[in-house]
Regions:
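HotDog/MaoC-like acyl-thioester-processing domains
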Residues: 13, 30, 100-104, 111-152
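A residue-level detector for short acidic-glycine micro-motifs
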Residues: 23-26, 93, 98, 112-114
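Hydrophobic beta-strand-centered segment that forms part of the acyl-chain substrate-binding groove
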Residues: 1-2, 69-107, 133-135, 140-141
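Hydrophobic core residues within well-ordered beta-strands of beta-rich domains
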Residues: 18-20, 106, 120
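Beta-strand-rich interaction surfaces with strong enrichment in secreted/lumenal proteins
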Residues: 9, 52, 95-98
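Catalytic strand-loop segment that frames the active site of acyl-thioester-processing enzymes
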Residues: 16-56, 61
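Helix-adjacent hinge/juxtasegments
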Residues: 49-81
């Protein structure tokens, strides 16, 4: 299964500048998913990260992997994005191996390692031109929107 940006927008609550998936190129429900993010110099963070040598922020690679895991969770067991939210609980064994720069096409992949009820654990990788840039283990949960803690 492949998802274009229109279908991604129906699943994820994220919008520009924090929607970090351009296309989901493969989904195997309950198993894995792959997506791409095309990095351009017009990204809003490049003027400050870093002006003389722009690099895609590593924390946004983790966010992109989290978004892809949310799409995989939806494809595995559809939920109503208006009433449910898929959110990140944590990351483990995170490694950043290569910088990502304007002009790169990030290839993202997530693979489910374990699922218990509403908790999902997955392995994620980000590569450019078949060179591994980063990898991490992701832990996330699906919950009712009204059960999320507020900032107060």
């Amino acid at each position: 299964m492949e998802l274009d940006i229109t279908r991604i927008l129906r699943i994820l609550p994220h919008r520009s500048p924090f929607l970090l998936l351009d296309r989901v190129i493969e989904v195997q429900p309950r198993k894995s998913a792959r997506a791409i993010k095309c990095v351009t110099y017009n990204e809003p963070f490049f003027p400050g990260h870093f002006p003389a040598q722009p690099m895609f922020p590593n924390v946004l690679v983790l966010e992109a992997l989290s978004q892809l895991l949310a799409v995989l969770a939806y494809a595995s067991d559809p939920f109503d994005p208006a009433t449910k939210v898929f959110y990140q609980l944590g990351f483990e064994n995170v490694k950043f191996r290569r910088p990502i720069v304007p002009g790169d096409r990030i290839e993202l992949s997530v693979e489910i390692v374990q699922r218990r009820s509403n908790i999902w654990k997955a392995k994620g990788e980000a590569s450019v031109d078949q060179h591994l840039c980063s990898h991490a283990e992701l832990l996330a949960a699906l919950t009712d929107r009204d059960e999320l803690p507020t900032g107060t």
